[in-house]
Each structure stands twice: as structure tokens, then as C-alpha cells.
Amino acid sequence: MFGGVKWSPQSWMSDTRSSIEKKCIGQVYMVGAHNAGTHGIQMFSPFGLDAPEKLRSLPPYVTFLLRFLTVGVSSRWGRCQNLSIRQLLDHGVRYLDLRMNISPDQENKIYTTHFHISVPLQEVLKDVKDFLTTPASANEFVILDFLHFYGFNESHTMKRFVEELQALEEFYIPTTVSLTTPLCNLWQSTRRIFLVVRPYVEYPYARLRSVALKSIWVNQMELNDLLDRLEELMTRDLEDVSIGGVPSKMYVTQAIGTPRNNDFAVAACCGACPGSHPDLYSAAKHKNPHLLKWFYDLNVNGVMRGERVTIRRGNNTHGNILLLDFVQEGTCTVKGVDKPMNAVALCVHLNTNQTARS
């Protein structure tokens, strides 16, 4: 309960309606799941088309032996979430980062991927539909961001992709509706999904990614390097006088680590090196609490690394979608609140209390 408002992860947007209804989607704090749909990756899952070609071209018996000897190191670093799409949504996640892959074994079968093939797109869409047709969650908004397509071609497989998307057509918010529209206006209809696609597709509900949101990959693994890069982005936008008013784009803060080759090598040794991370889960479990504390300090106190900054109204840099690996991991302490908060609770707190952007 924040500010006298009771909320649940399945319905936090509806529960905090009085606090967020005058905001547009780009002004609402929420948690995003990096590489959502990778929960299905297992030790011997087939390589996706986003995996290095040298690995994909190896004979099956060689890849089997390689995975066996390294205890499936590539799958342990390829899996960014261990919750299904429905579980992520029930947990309170409202932004799903998705990568698509054409299956090499079944013609036109579309799967999620991150170095390894995971679950069918149809399963992803079904989970989203089941969530939105649950009465408690019927007023929640969801952002589907399809940013990578491996093995697709415009004339055939992209057409199949659009056909599969039609399973949720009744929920898509038309592209004619501006992203600056207040949520109170959007709640007047039953459409709840912002559909974002990186390549242009002929579909009236698909927003071109470059127009709909800003999401900068910082390409760092070490925590301090990651925070430094995120703060560089904030500093740059603080100096941009053109930023103001109601943001016309959503903003994704990529609070995620990007593993290097040496991370894979060390992990293959099964954690033989002290302080090393055997998988992405371990790395996220270590980083997420620090990232949540940084996000809190910036948005509540206007502080970056101990120094106060002034955030112009309308600047949603690091003030909208917090993208995480293993979103359920990590908590931070919030002033005036007895119990530590996870990422979703922190975002609800920011939405219902005074912030440095208010």
C-alpha cells in the first residue's frame, strides 16, 4: 500500500489509476523484461540464428559434446528470464522485449530466441491474451517490442509474423492514437497493447520502433561501467534544451549486462574463479539491487553518484521503462517504507509519490 492505495502486481495500473491517469505511457514508471520468452531455453536447446555461425555450423555430435563439457554455458547465459510471459505479466512487468527466430526444423514456425530457440510466438501471444482477458488485469497496458527478426524475409516469413499477431488484434491500440495521449483517454476503450516493431511492416497497429521509443544499448558488463554509461546518457539529455513537455516517445533504460567472451570462458570452468558468475542469473542477482538503488536515487532525489541534478519536466530519460534481466531478483530500501521493494514495487512507489520529475 502506497499513499493509501492498495495494489496487486496483476492490476497495479488500474489500482493506481488516480495517480497515473493524466500521464501518457511514456511518463509511467514500469518494469521491462529483457529477452522475454527465453525461459524455455535448456541445456540442449537448438542454436538460434542469432548465435555465432561458427557454433551453428558445427556437427551435431560436436555441439552435444561441447555443451556437455561446458555444462551448457551458452544456454545459461542465453536465458535472461526464468518466468513465462504470463508469469512476468502477473509479476507486474508491462514491457516485453522480444526477439524472433524462424525455426530451422519447421517451416515458418516462429520462436523467441537469444542464442538458443526458446518458445513459440503463439505461446507468447496466448499468455498475453490470457492475462488481458482475466478480469483483474483487463485494464492493464502492455507494450510488446519486437526488435530483432532472424531468418525472416519481407515477402514470406514477415507475412506469417503479421498473421500470428492478429491473435491479439482486438487489443492493439491503433497507430493513429498518439503516444502522448493520457491514459484516462485510453481507458475509455478496451484496447490495451502498444505494438512496437523494429522493421516497418504493413499492419495498421504496428508502430515503427524508432518513432515509438528510445532504447540505447550500453554494451557493458561490469556494474560500475554500466552505471557510468547510463549516467552519460542522462547527462547528455539533461543538456538538451529541446526536451520538454509531454514526451512523444517511450524511454527504455537498458539496465542489463552484456557478457563478454571471457565471461563465457570463466563460466565454462563452472565457477572455478572466485567472484565469477556461472550464468546470467547470478550476474543479475548481483547487479539488480544496485541498479534499483541507482534508479531510486535518480528519480526520487535527483541524484547521480552523489551529485544533485535538475531534471527538466518532460524528460523521461531513465524515467519510464526499467529493463532488467531476471526481473524478480533484487530489492532496494526506500525512505519511509519498512520493507525493501522489488523492481515492480519501486515503480509503483515512483508513480504514486513525488519525484524529482514532478
From Swiss-Prot:
GO BP: glycerophospholipid metabolic process; lipid metabolic process
CDD domains: PI-PLCXDc_like (cd08587)
Domain PI-PLC X-box: 25-198
Reactions accelerated catalytically: a 6-(alpha-D-glucosaminyl)-1-(1,2-diacyl-sn-glycero-3-phospho)-1D-myo-inositol = 6-(alpha-D-glucosaminyl)-1D-myo-inositol 1,2-cyclic phosphate + a 1,2-diacyl-sn-glycerol
Single GO MF annotation: glycosylphosphatidylinositol diacylglycerol-lyase activity
Subcellular location: Membrane
Pfam families: PI-PLC-X
Topology in the lipid bilayer: Peripheral membrane protein
EC number: 4.6.1.14
Keywords: Lyase, Membrane
A GO term from the CC aspect: plasma membrane
Post-translational modification: The N-terminus is blocked.
Chief place where the protein resides: membrane
PANTHER family per the UniProt record, alphabetical: PTHR13593, SI:DKEY-266F7.9
Quaternary structure (record): Monomer.
Job of this protein: By hydrolysis of the attached glycolipid, releases soluble variant surface glycoprotein containing phosphoinositol from the cell wall of T.brucei after cell lysis. It also cleaves similar membrane anchors on some mammalian proteins. VSG lipase may play a role in processes such as parasite differentiation or antigenic variation.
UniProt protein name: Variant-surface-glycoprotein phospholipase C
Species per Swiss-Prot/TrEMBL record: Trypanosoma brucei brucei
